[in-house]
């Protein structure tokens, strides 16, 4: 990502909108025992388009804001979202991010990693983590719901962050060279 005041403003608006929607509406909306976790998808989208450093910073800021707004134990969400942001950003740096359906898999993997890591950290800190088979079902349903909502969230995030991106993954896909039209392979260089 290009570091500028506009970039900080765009990412801040995205995170603030995600946290407000998460706490005011989506956390009360239970679907089959799970819920949509918009903050994880917003952090994953910023990391997917901005890289690992932007993912770490975005994850920490979103987790800190979410912990402050919800009154949860400080640092748990920011620690886990920092790791999720770094992991998604590192994946983007190593792999080609230009496939159109890759946000589905990235959103599912980020959500699954967040749910497992958040449960582990909460259990280690004894923050009232419950151990039950229903928790596993809720984690699977939450991961599937986030996978369904990943594509619209990633598309909206890309449109919001596009002026701040160094490389737009969709432009890479559109600018691929057409196949060369030359003569038969054996006659190259003979200028026939």
Labelled PLM ranges:
Residues 1-192:
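Terminal, non-globular segments
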